[in-house]
Amino acid sequence: MTAQLFDSHAHVDGPEFDADRDEVLARARAAGVQRMVVIGAVGDPSSAERSVALAERDPNIWATVATHPHDVKGLTPEWWAIHERLARHPRVVGIGETGLDYYYDHSPREAQRDAFVKFIALAKQVDKPVVCHIRDAHDDARAILREHLPAGLGCIIHCFTGTPDDARAYAELDCYVSFSGIVTYKTAQPLRDAVPLVPRERLLIETDCPYLSPVPKRGKRCEPGFVVHTAEVVAREAGLSYEELAAQTTANALRIYRLADA
């Protein structure tokens, strides 16, 4: 039996999958990816609505909702009302992705910080974990998390791209740390060095599809089934067998997303 995996962060709601979404999901399950969380946070709230709709029709898919830090400059009261409504949906298991992206700065940094704090507050209201997008902003992100994230609420640092020291610092904040296909890239040795610094009970894996296809699939549209390649590398760096890594990261995803009975 193929080891079961959980893709903790995917964007299969997007238009990149409109032509073959069912086939993509079938390939994922054939590869052992039995569960996934679809992140409804790209652009306007239609992404959140699509993600929730997808989760409603598939018992092994769940959704999150928020506005990506790239797009918070357009976060209107109308958008916010949609997020508040969807955040309470029973198939929504987290608030995100939210956070800070100082690499692209598509939205002003002050707007990013303000939105991050607001989405953490929304997560507290609905008692669901926060899914964080943090790029080149780890010090500011940790300062916000220390001040605003309630103990026990839960936080995922998705697509971790920080240093080993950053990984250690997030672990000290009791955050879960998720590794994407980037960890398989030749130039990503610092990421691989970070893997053993994350407590095993806080490790997650993801595709972030359709982006960041892992080796040996680079250059192709990423899809959930490709998480097997990320799992192989993370298992090696964590000192686990593939089967142990699959079981551990699946248990971790079920715990942080509060899906223990799923």
Can you say where each PLM-predicted feature lies in the sequence?
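Mid-domain alpha/beta scaffold segments of enzyme catalytic cores
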Residues: 1-262
